[in-house]
């Protein structure tokens, strides 16, 4: 580059070259500023249209910043994966696939639309992979799209390649372990991380992630030990522990900790104010212990004392509180008085209670409300089928069971053995497995036939 500039200078055209660069730079800045204004003013569609127009009119004025803005715009307007692939193709065409910020943004975009395969393609084609932000984006993409096994595998590869860790990437890895219930693996990751980088041991966010992993995995004793050992605590620390107790059937411990949270923490000389997430844990604890009046009091306190606006989760907890206590009428009235439109989760909570208490009339009404939102959930048919069965309405039950058989999908679960995550499927989910199941059944049939021919008594020793 220096040789070219010297040559231009010797020819006396360097001033013209400077003018061209200045013109090019000014045009790009104006274009990028316009895109930024559209994005900040909440008009992502206009920004994307403007970007496409400018590219068609004068492709040379599109720089890496323009492309970066276009990706952000696509993410902001929840664009389709096709839009992302078009920008992805442009990135390749312009040779920007070595720009980490662009590649990281593309990974984030594909993750937001659930297209993890394309996100991985972007990751793999990035020539320089020493940037921790890129690894974090890809591992987060797997975790956010319910592919925690791949997230852990990629984290292990990152460790093997000696990429410098930070608190964020370890937090994401612990989140993946929490999703899988892989406590041992999470503990190993945390231990290795603080050995490689000692200051991570003082990272409160990271310790909160470890606490959250214990909580999600039902390890409340380990969670409480970590909680008590933490010199510093914030609202997330308390909220995670309150949630942990509530989720694992220790409602009284959850409510006691909530009371302690609101008193002065002598070690920090501060009062930790609960947030909206904290109240979800508190309401869950009230629900699981049948404390209807206390739950109603906390729900009111959240609004009046802490000026917090209830979200769907809070309304859902209140409906669950009424339903668990058998107050179906109160639950129904509460739903009808909600300031927001109730979602299927809230209606299904009431439907489950109708099934438990055999309330056919209310159950049928609730199912109609659910079908207005979603007709494909198998559990809705099962719940109503159980209601019919409890009342001896066998014809209606039979119709519901027929619908269930047509819609049922196999479930999945995971188990940690050593340092390996194993996946199990409740039924065959592809043709190969169906063939294998058929072969196993045939072999079993032959064995039974042979045993019978030799006068063996199945299930007894000879």
UniProtKB/Swiss-Prot annotation:
Q: Where is this region: Type E motif?
A: 346-418
Q: Which GO terms describe its molecular function?
A: RNA binding
Specify whether Membrane is a keyword of the entry: no
Keywords of this entry:
Repeat
Q: Where does each PPR repeat begin and end? A: 63-98, 99-129, 131-165, 166-200, 203-233, 234-268, 275-310, 311-341
Give the start-end ranges of region Type E(+) motif: 419-452
Q: Which GO terms describe its biological process?
A: RNA modification
The record ties this protein, via Pfam families, to: E_motif, PPR
Which NCBIfam families does its entry note? PPR
Q: Give the matching PANTHER family.
A: PENTATRICOPEPTIDE REPEAT-CONTAINING PROTEIN (PTHR47926:SF347)
Q: What is this protein called?
A: Putative pentatricopeptide repeat-containing protein At1g74400
